Amino acid sequence: MGWKTSLILIESKDNNVSDAEILKALGIGEIKSQSDSSFDAFNYLDDGSIAIGRVNGNLVICDGYYITEKSLEMPRSLRLCKEEKALCKLFPNSEMVSVACYSAINYHGYSLIQNGNKLRLKTISDGERARQFGKRTKEEDEIYKGSFVKKRATYWKDDLDPDEDIGEDQMMEDFTFEMAKRRLGVRLDGADGMEILNEPFIKYFPVKPIKLTEVDEVPKKTSWKTYAIIIALVLLWQVFKRLLF
């Protein structure tokens, strides 16, 4: 199955924060309409809506990358983005896990916030090295146990073909859904996860649809900046060689 998923999972056992408060905190404007949905709609949410529900003692926001693009892709540190700060004000003593993945480019990213402090952030996509800040979580430690390093990159052996190595970006489902399991209690891509996909959600359609951005836009920008620097250095070296020799 292909995945294009973006979720914010917030510990919310008391369940005393309304959807209206959440939408306001996220800067979502006037709502044009809403419709009943289910958690199953969290995959491929790309219609300009945002969905909210409650699952296993957690508030779950399906955001179509509206928040996670800012909280996972753009940061270059463990600082909170504006939307994360707003959510932390509503849930000051809660744990918050954000996860996102996109099968087409082997992209996955996730972060962990506790008591208003971001403790972990990692993103990776096809052809890119992992960008990460903070200490690994216990979920990550379990996955990395079976890994090895080759040419400064992390790999795993393919269970079906021991001669093949699996790159870190190809471990998308393991990292994404193990981190989500930290809050939900089950893996969404497993048999147990099927049981919670019928949990009721409400999809909200703002008058001004939320702006969706391709998750690989920032890595591409970063790559072009890197290439530009390399080209500039090569040109400078050529100039210096002519001057010196």
Question: Where in this protein do the model-derived segments appear?
Answer:
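Short, extreme N-terminal segment that most often corresponds to the first beta-strand
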Residues: 1-30
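Short loop/turn segments at secondary-structure transitions that flank enzyme active sites
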Residues: 14, 67, 127
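Short, intrinsically disordered low-complexity segments
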Residues: 27-119
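Long, compositionally biased intrinsically disordered terminal regions
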Residues: 120-218
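Juxtamembrane boundary at the C-terminal end of a transmembrane helix
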Residues: 237-245
